[in-house]
From Swiss-Prot:
Keywords: Bacterial flagellum, Coiled coil, Secreted. One of its GO terms (molecular function) is structural molecule activity. Belongs to the bacterial flagellin family. The keyword Cytoplasm does not apply. Residues 98-139, 311-339 form a coiled coil. The gene is flaE. V.cholerae is able to differentially regulate the flagellins within the flagellum maybe to produce flagella which are particularly suited for motility within a given environment. NCBIfam families: PRK08869.1-1 (NF006466), PRK08869.1-3 (NF006468), PRK08869.1-4 (NF006469). Pfam families: Flagellin_C (PF00700), Flagellin_IN (PF07196), Flagellin_N (PF00669). GO terms for cellular component: bacterial-type flagellum; extracellular region. This is Flagellin E. PANTHER family: FLAGELLIN (PTHR42792:SF2). It comes from Vibrio cholerae serotype O1 (strain ATCC 39315 / El Tor Inaba N16961).
Length: 378
């Protein structure tokens, strides 16, 4: 090997290896101190892109979980208030049944009506004051809300909260009363037993209820017979002996029409639309109608509570799935981005040794030109 002065090849080689060892050592120290295998695009350009996409998705999943929990909180708040609404309606039904009893005097029915009015006020107060973060839930203002329970656009679920005020149309129905008064001698006679009730249901389809009354039944027995034949229409008798019929507003898109020989005799007329808000149990007939109206209201409230319960379960399952996806994505991202400490520690020790060796070799290589000077002197 030639001995030169201008170019110290050995020193250059040693310096290159020293620089490489130093660079690799710095990389290992950076990974060990940060905990990340990828700290910049130069470490792994493709891996950095994949890792960033995974982290974006994981952040979205975290927000989706929080959104779903907010939805559950809203539903729990609303459902808790509706539980009290149910209790109030049940108490109002008890009062209606009590007032319908013939043992009550007019004064006692007035007292019962006063409690009914107080309960109605409380029912409306609950509907007006139940709120979540300042947003009213049960007075009809909430309507629909969209809850983003996914990490991407389009992964939203609609939540509806219904109006729980006592004047809501869903909490009532149409009442009818016969013009004819049935005295103690009144009976269903032969040839006058047919009562046909026709209406258009909420889906726009024609419905027809046919009642073939039993000959010899009095007006109370006729009402009982009608109730046994259909669950769409409820029948009762007021204190004057008039037949009363009621159908929930949600069952029909219009009013009832009556035909048949018995209908001609009874002469059924529309009394009006009754809701919980305008119930009057100061008479036996009003109390009987109130029971039917409150039954409609209870079905309405309980039905919506069931919907909210099902939606809460749906949100809980959505959260479980989001957590599971987040867990798997975090594991995937860790495999791509996180540093392997066993590997990096080994690499660090290796590069430290190489750095020390390269430093020693470089020092020796730099002494080689001195041998040329030694030759010249001798």
């Amino acid at each position: 090997m030639a001995m030169t002065v201008n170019t110290n090849v050995s020193a250059l080689v040693a310096q290159r290896h020293l620089n490489s060892a130093s660079e690799m050592l710095n990389q290992s120290l950076e990974r060990l101190s940060s905990g990340n295998r990828i700290n910049s695009a130069k470490d792994d350009a493709a891996g950095l892109q994949i890792s960033n996409r995974l982290e974006t998705q994981m952040r979205g999943l975290g927000i989706a979980v929080r959104n779903a929990n907010d939805g559950i909180s809203i539903m729990q708040t609303a459902e808790g208030a509706m539980q009290e609404t149910t209790q109030l309606l049940q108490r109002m039904r008890d009062l209606s049944l009590q007032s319908a009893n013939g043992s009550n005097s007019a004064a006692e029915r007035v007292a019962l009506q006063e409690e009914m009015a107080a309960l109605n006020d409380e029912l409306n107060r609950i509907a007006e004051t139940t709120s979540f973060a300042g947003r009213k839930l049960l007075n009809g203002q909430f309507m629909k809300a969209s809850f983003q329970i996914g990490a991407s656009s389009g992964e939203a679920v609609q939540l509806s909260l219904r109006n729980m005020r006592s004047d809501s149309l869903e909490m009532g129905g149409f009442s009818y009363v016969a013009a004819a008064l049935a005295d103690k001698q009144w009976q269903v006679t032969k040839g006058k037993q047919q009562l046909n009730i026709s209406y258009v249901n909420a889906q726009g389809e024609n419905e027809n209820i046919q009642i073939q009354a039993k000959e010899g039944d009095d007006i109370e027995e006729l009402a009982t017979y009608i109730n046994g034949k259909t669950d769409k229409v409820s029948a009762s008798v007021n204190e004057k002996g008039q037949l009363q019929l009621y159908i929930a507003g949600k069952e029909t898109s219009g009013t009832l029409s009556f035909s048949g020989s018995l209908a001609n005799e009874l002469q059924m007329n529309l009394l009006g639309y009754e809701a919980v808000d305008n119930l009057d149990i100061s008479s036996a007939g009003g109390a009987q109608r109130a029971v039917s109206v409150i039954d409609t209201a209870l079905k309405y409230v309980d039905g919506h509570r069931s919907e909210l319960g099902a939606m809460q379960n749906r949100f809980q399952h959505a959260i479980s799935n989001l957590d599971n996806v987040h867990e798997n994505l975090a594991a995937s991202n860790s495999r791509i981005k996180d540093a392997d400490y066993a590997k990096e520690t080994t690499q660090m020790i290796k590069q430290q040794i190489l750095q020390q060796v390269s430093t020693s070799v470089l020092a020796q290589a730099k002494r080689q030109p001195k041998f040329v000077l030694f030759l010249l002197r001798n």
